[in-house]
Amino acid sequence: MKKGRGLALLLAGAILPALSGCLLPPDAPSVLASAGGTGPDDAYVVYSVEQEYEVLRLLGLRPERQSLHIIDGRAFDVIIATNPETGEARDVWFDISRFFGRL
């Protein structure tokens, strides 16, 4: 085995297990498929404000108003959003506990 290849394998063996604990947040389509966003027990779990707006975009909704709710120690954004084609408004719940209040 070449010296450089052995070093690469050694480094990979040390780095890959360490990185296995680093999980990326799910993408917006995965978030969308995981819940319905109809209330605190069915809220979309998101990892950023940008992800909230990406979910709204995928739903075809336009945000109108937003409010913060703290329920049982969990933080939720409730966005009243409108379907631009029908004018129908609905509340969309997002669980923002994973990033709310963190720098």
Please tell me what each predicted stretch does.
Residues L23-P25:
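Bacterial signal peptide processing site
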Residues M1-L10:
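Bacterial N-terminal signal peptides that target proteins for export
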Residues L68-L103:
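Short, compact, well-ordered microdomains
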Residues D27-S30:
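Intrinsically disordered, low-complexity, charge-dense segments enriched in Lys/Arg
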Residues A18-G21:
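C-terminal motif of bacterial Sec signal peptides marking the signal peptidase cleavage site
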Residues A33-E52:
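Solvent-exposed, low-complexity, repeat-rich "mucin-like" stalks and linkers
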Residues R57-S67:
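Charged, amphipathic alpha-helical segments
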